[in-house]
Regions:
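Bacterial N-terminal signal peptides
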Residues: 9-17
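Surface-exposed, proline-enriched loop/turn segments that connect beta strands in immunoglobulin-like
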Residues: 60-63, 89, 153-155
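Active-site-adjacent mobile loop/cap segments within catalytic or ligand-binding domains
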Residues: 505, 512-515, 525-527, 554-618
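Active-site histidine-acidic residue metal-binding/catalytic motifs
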Residues: 414-494, 498-502, 512-515, 520-522
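Active-site-adjacent substrate-binding region
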Residues: 531-556, 566
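Signal-peptide-cleaved, periplasmic/extracellular N-terminal interaction regions immediately downstream
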Residues: 23-43, 51-56, 75-78, 95-97, ...
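Active-site-proximal beta-strand/loop segments in catalytic clefts of secreted hydrolases
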Residues: 333-334, 435-438, 477-482, 505-510, ...
Length: 618
């Protein structure tokens, strides 16, 4: 899934924060329960990869790719797997099906992979070219100069008192260097990389300091004739009040507040949420969440206003009602502001943390009572931050939760209890959503023979769906056919809209460029995000490990968008590696896909027995 394909930028791994389970137990030895018996599904053939008529076919890297690395993997196929095959004079092993994968050195400039296949009719030759940028070198020492392309910051900055910022340039080595905002004093720069001549100066905006917006001026050397350069970014500091940013509506229904302009995601405000905006870095706007806590949003995703009143939500009364699935907690607010939900590791409590808010809750009403929620408490955690804690009754635990603004400014937290499970048939009656990753417009990774990940994912999902039907479950597929186009954000949304009880996203792996595919054993990985999904991830991981079909790369926490689905236990499974010839060959075998499906369903059964309400049906 991680392989970078020129035609497919499929954002399956968005980073962020939220209810992260402790990963301390991952990797420790533990007894695995016996796998439940699962009847085999009918074998469904995978659409075979296209067979090239050429003696040698390169699949990766693409022609003309630009790559900054010292080594790169190369894969494709040959017409005769028994013939001697070499790339740049190095013998390359070929799988019996004709696929090959090599890890080879590359050098700067236009680099050519020259492949030779010794056929009985003569030697077949094929070439694949890429460009490797040369390593950075210093400027000549015999002349004072500044590299204008190196001047940083490269994007406009809007700063406030207390903000730290950095000016940087590349210039002749070992010389005095200075920088200034036009009209301001010159400030010395320090040479932080003497080998390349990289200079930096770090600043903090002083209280009441104002300047700009204007580009920085840089100088190398001393005296009036010393070379100078002017940056392209405009930098400013202001004492004006912050703007108000209002989240725009989008396809996902939420925005991603990041830890830095290019950092990981941390909070996900819904459309209409208002925040103070008190800084800017290029196309990113800094928003204030609470005392000492800020994040960054894409400027295009918010409406900015300098005339609106700042967000100050008041938290009113709280109501708790029983629902068929569990309970619903409604928190009255005077306006929409950002919030986050954090569940504890024991899965018996959740905290709704509301930003830009003041608590004024006099009543917590249990309407008709609740056998699921025990108590609701609130406190002013910090100035502008209210924490509402929902604790379940003893012995109860979360199966999932969903938080949203209901209509206007009322915040609704739906809590889901575990479904009833029949010990003899633990999956009977459960809706299991299978998400075959990728689609025709974003096909994912590709194998040496040309097998597309999206097709392998779908074939595994079909095999698992048939097994689930035999177990009495109702399988739901996010992609109903191999040609369906389903966006990434629509996949977890389907789980909510179609009433799924579990969500499993099925993938097969690739590797980022410059990563040695032979550096360690590679095989399956299971990913989870929320604490209430850890048990599902562990059960499926253990079932795959017991089946021992490919090497085990572990159970991992990861901030993947589909795994962040909170309404039900949700995981993502990387079944095998598309780019490894032997694993691509296995994925093209119906019997192997059947074994994967058997392991998956066995893990789901064990999870249902462990986490579900296992009272016997009448």
């Amino acid at each position: 899934m991680n392989q970078r394909l020129a035609a497919a930028a499929y954002a399956a791994a968005l980073l962020g924060s939220g209810a992260a389970a402790s990963a301390a137990s991952i990797g420790k030895s533990r007894l695995r329960p016996p796998l439940p018996r699962v009847e085999a599904a009918p074998i469904v053939p995978l659409h075979p990869p296209r067979v090239s008529s050429e003696p040698i076919t390169f699949v990766w890297p693409p022609e003309g790719m630009v790559l900054s690395a010292e080594e790169e993997f190369v894969f494709g196929s040959v017409a005769d797997p028994d013939a001697h095959f070499a790339i740049n004079g190095q013998t390359v092993a070929v799988h019996k099906d004709g696929g090959f994968l090599a890890w080879l050195p590359i050098s700067a400039g236009t680099f050519t992979f020259r492949a030779e296949l010794a056929l009985s009719s003569g030697t077949a030759v094929a070439e694949r070219r890429l460009f490797v940028p040369p390593p950075p070198v210093p400027l000549p020492d015999d002349k004072l100069a500044i590299d204008p392309a190196s001047l940083s910051p490269k994007a406009d900055l809007e700063l406030r008192a207390g903000d730290w910022w950095t000016a940087r340039m590349k210039a002749t080595r070992g010389k005095p260097a200075r920088v200034r905002v036009p009209g301001g004093p010159w400030r010395d720069m320090r040479e932080v990389n003497p080998r390349l001549g990289i200079y930096e100066a770090v600043f903090q905006v002083a209280p009441r300091e104002e300047f700009g917006p204007a580009p920085l001026q840089y100088q190398i050397g001393s005296g009036g004739s010393a070379p100078r350069a002017t940056g392209t970014a405009r930098v400013s500091a202001t004492v004006m009040p912050p703007s108000v940013a209002t989240a725009k509506a989008n396809a996902a229904g939420f925005l991603n507040v990041k830890t830095a302009p290019s950092g990981g995601f941390m909070v996900f405000p819904p459309a209409g949420a208002r925040m103070l905006a008190d800084g800017r870095d290029g196309d990113s706007v800094r928003v204030e969440l609470g005392p000492g806590l800020s994040g960054w949003l894409d400027a295009k995703d918010v409406e900015l206003s300098t005339s609106s009143l700042p967000p100050r939500a008041e938290i009113g009364n709280v109501g708790v009602t029983e629902t068929p699935a569990g309970a619903s907690v409604r928190i009255s607010l005077s306006e929409r502001v950002p919030f986050e939900v954090v569940e504890n590791d024991a899965q018996d409590a959740a905290v709704v943390r509301i930003f830009s808010a003041t608590g004024h809750t006099n009543i917590v009403a249990f309407e008709g009572g609740s056998d699921f929620v025990d108590q609701v408490r609130w406190r002013q955690e910090a100035t502008g931050v209210v924490a509402v804690t929902v604790r379940l009754k003893p012995g109860r635990r979360l199966w999932g939760w969903n938080a949203r603004y209901d209509g206007g400014a009322s915040l609704r937290l739906d809590l889901r209890r575990p479904p009833r499970v029949n010990r003899r048939r633990p999956l009977e009656g459960l809706k299991v959503m299978l998400d075959p990753g990728h689609m025709p417009s974003a096909p994912g990774a590709v194998g040496p023979l040309g097998t597309k990940e999206m097709d392998a994912n779908y074939a595994i999902a079909e095999a698992a769906a048939e097994l689930l039907r035999r177990e009495g479950a109702l399988p739901l597929l996010t992609r109903g056919t191999t040609t369906d186009e389903v966006s990434l954000v629509d996949r977890p949304r389907q789980a909510v809209d179609r009433g799924a009880d579990m969500f499993i996203s099925l993938h097969n792996n690739g590797l980022p460029d410059g990563t040695n595919p032979f550096s360690k054993p590679r095989g399956f990985t299971v990913f989870y995000y929320h604490p209430h999904s850890l048990a599902l991830g562990r059960a499926v991981h253990d079932a795959y490990a017991k089946a021992a079909l490919v090497p085990d790369e572990g159970l991992q926490w990861d901030n993947l968008l589909v795994a962040r689905l909170s309404a039900v236990p949700s995981i993502l499974v990387e079944n095998a590696y598309m780019i490894l010839p032997e694993q691509e060959a296995l994925l093209n075998e119906p019997a192997f896909r059947e074994k994967l499906a058997v392991a998956l369903v066995a893990g789901l059964k064990n999870f249902a027995l462990e986490a579900g309400d296992t009272e016997k049906k009448p």
